[in-house]
Amino acid sequence: MPQKVLYYEKRHKEYMEQRMEISLRPITEDNFIDAFNLKLAREQERFVSHPIRSLAQAYVYREQCQPFGIYQGERMVGYVMVIYDYDVPEYDVWHMMIDEAQQGKGYGKAALAQVLAYIGQKPFGDSGRIALTCNRDNAKALALYRAAGFAPSGNEDEDEIGLVLNI
């Protein structure tokens, strides 16, 4: 039993250290080109919209969303957008991606923790519900979201699965 506790403490410490080196920074005129330059592997391109499209949506929904660059130190390694749906009400996580050259380093997990902390501040409105959709073939992303506590919402289409987390 003590070995399991030590293992958990070690893993938790590693996770927290990793989370601390990852930060979210709003997309601005100073860094939007870095977001445009993020790349996915060819087989991943069908899983998530490119930041160019996402930033166009951010402009339309600018009163209720925040696009972020995901940074490791001073380098943008990914992108994510948080949007508040006043009609439901709920927070939605859109277009989360980690650059193909930066994948497999735990940045997605650390960034998701930062996103959840941001949403926990309720920047746009009061809701304890967080929703997202994920391509059913994106096994790595599905595993990430499920490990964070997201569960199927019951909303599905032929390509995507809806997931929800209540906080």
Residue map of PLM features:
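Conserved active-site alpha-helix within GNAT-family acetyltransferase domains
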Residues: 109, 136-154
